[in-house]
């Protein structure tokens, strides 16, 4: 048995979709364990583009079991729409290939209303939420009033759950100048889709326990990145779930002993979507070039990503909090043609040099990057599949990142194509 967790080691958008797709060829089961449909994956397979947000990336590969774990908040309407979308692209989806945790919490239309109203009220201080109801759904989950997948099979329990929700949401919506919530309409909408959703529902913890006992290879697919973790990220400019690798266990129902390798993904530079501190941001021609060449626009939202140099301090911290075993470095080809490339090796804060990202919001905004400059390369790295295909300067760059982060590179991705990967160590081989 081997369990590999894939987590982003920056602010998300590190190319997890491609790497998970590549690793899924070695896996029997692919599991989503946190987040919702707020983080998109783009997969390019035989020239065909698949855009996923909620569904595990393993679905686009035949012969794999894909699982949505209990740690995910699920918009059931979006789930069904996304299933229909990839079915239209020729992908077979059935209860034999996709399983949904029966104890996963649901995202409701009310959650989206609240998300959008709160974000709009913040004005210039907006966090940058996708307004898809993720945060409010997690609030109801923690508040023990969430509607869960299993409740769709029990109309009597659904009535009680909706009454409990109404007691909380009525005054909340009134304070946000939102219309009175309609419990009857919500129940009718949920019961209408219940048969379709319940067809995929199972006790995922039990299913995965059986897979572990049989020695199956399980790939745990994280969403977002560690620096968006609700505890360890740039709070409050974070997501509403735990993104670190440790949550792969809690968010799927398997014990931590099932995890044998943690793969941390990082771009060869840095990007961020939405507001929040970003020490190495390049709000200039360099940032524009990175964004243009790297096609840095959100899969779900289309929002332009902020771009900057690689921040080894941040990635090292993300690796520490997630227990990363090895790195997968992506988008190395975007740096082709730069005469020089900078790497952040430390921060300056109030005149002192520090080697970590501080927890306080004021300090996070005040840190200044300390850079090391490396020579760039004029040759192309695009499509490289071995070290010998890389310009010498690119090899030096990758090796320097390994030194600064303190983790070896297991994989280097050199294009969006699935097979354009330099493999140093197969995570499933330990």
UniProtKB/Swiss-Prot annotation:
Keywords: Cytoplasm, GTP-binding, Ligase, Magnesium, Metal-binding, Nucleotide-binding, Purine biosynthesis. Its EC number is 6.3.4.4. IMP binds at residues 13-16, 38-41, 130, 144, 224, 239, 303. InterPro entries: Adenylosuccin_syn_GTP-bd (IPR018220), Adenylosuccinate_synth_dom1 (IPR042109), Adenylosuccinate_synth_dom2 (IPR042110), Adenylosuccinate_synth_dom3 (IPR042111), Adenylosuccinate_synthetase (IPR001114), P-loop_NTPase (IPR027417). The active site is at residues 13, 41. Its main location: cytoplasm. GTP binds at residues 12-18, 40-42, 305, 331-333, 413-415. Mg(2+) binds at residues 13, 40. GO terms for biological process: 'de novo' AMP biosynthetic process; IMP metabolic process. Transmembrane segments: none annotated. Substrate binds at residues 299-305. GO terms for cellular component: cytoplasm. It catalyses: IMP + L-aspartate + GTP = N(6)-(1,2-dicarboxyethyl)-AMP + GDP + phosphate + 2 H(+). The keyword Cytoplasm applies. Binds 1 Mg(2+) ion per subunit. The keyword Repeat does not apply. GO terms for molecular function: adenylosuccinate synthase activity; GTP binding; magnesium ion binding. Its cofactor is Mg(2+). Pathway: Purine metabolism; AMP biosynthesis via de novo pathway; AMP from IMP: step 1/2. It is found in: Cytoplasm. Belongs to the adenylosuccinate synthetase family. Homodimer. Plays an important role in the de novo pathway of purine nucleotide biosynthesis. Catalyzes the first committed step in the biosynthesis of AMP from IMP. NCBIfam families: PRK01117.1, purA. This is Adenylosuccinate synthetase. The lineage of its organism: Bacteria, Pseudomonadati, Pseudomonadota, Alphaproteobacteria, Hyphomonadales. The gene is purA.
């Amino acid at each position: 048995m081997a369990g590999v967790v894939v987590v982003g080691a920056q602010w998300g958008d590190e190319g997890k979709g491609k790497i998970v797709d590549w690793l899924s060829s070695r896996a029997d089961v692919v599991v989503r364990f946190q987040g919702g449909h707020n983080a998109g994956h783009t997969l390019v397979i035989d020239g065909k583009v698949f855009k996923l947000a909620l569904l595990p990336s393993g679905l686009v590969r035949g012969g794999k079991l894909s699982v949505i774990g209990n740690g995910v908040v699920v918009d059931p309407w979006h789930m069904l729409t996304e299933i229909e979308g990839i079915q239209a692209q020729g992908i077979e989806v059935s209860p034999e290939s996709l399983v949904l945790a029966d104890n996963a919490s649901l995202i409701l239309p009310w959650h989206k209303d609240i998300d959008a109203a709160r974000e709009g009220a913040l004005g210039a201080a907006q966090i940058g939420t996708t307004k898809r109801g993720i945060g409010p759904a997690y609030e109801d989950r923690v508040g023990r009033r969430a509607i869960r997948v299993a409740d769709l099979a029990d109309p009597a329990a659904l009535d009680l759950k909706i009454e409990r929700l109404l007691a909380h949401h009525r005054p909340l919506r009134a304070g946000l100048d939102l219309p009175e919530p309609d419990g009857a309409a919500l129940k009718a909408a949920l019961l209408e889709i219940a048969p379709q959703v319940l067809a995929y529902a199972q006790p995922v913890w039990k299913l995965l326990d059986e897979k572990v006992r049989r020695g199956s290879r399980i790939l745990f697919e994280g969403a977002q990145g560690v620096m968006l973790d609700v505890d360890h990220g740039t709070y409050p400019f974070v997501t509403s779930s735990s993104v670190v690798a440790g949550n792969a266990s809690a968010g799927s129902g398997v014990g931590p002993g099932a995890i044998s390798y943690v793969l941390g993904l990082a771009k060869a530079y840095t990007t961020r979507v939405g507001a929040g501190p970003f020490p190495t941001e390049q709000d200039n021609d360099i940032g524009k070039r990175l964004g243009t060449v790297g096609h840095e626009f959100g899969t779900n939202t289309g929002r332009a990503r902020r771009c900057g140099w690689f921040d080894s301090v941040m990635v090292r911290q993300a690796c520490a909090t997630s227990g990363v075993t090895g790195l997968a470095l992506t988008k190395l080809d975007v740096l082709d043609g730069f005469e020089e490339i900078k790497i952040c090796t430390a921060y300056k804060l109030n005149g002192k040099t520090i080697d970590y990202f501080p927890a306080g919001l004021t300090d996070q905004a005040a840190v200044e990057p300390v850079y090391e400059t490396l020579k760039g390369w004029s040759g192309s790295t695009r499509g490289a599949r071995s070290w010998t295909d890389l310009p010498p300067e690119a090899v030096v760059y990758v090796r320097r990142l390994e030194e600064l982060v303190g983790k070896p590179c297991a994989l280097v991705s050199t294009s969006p194509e699935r097979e354009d990967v330099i493999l140093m160590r197969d995570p499933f081989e330990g």
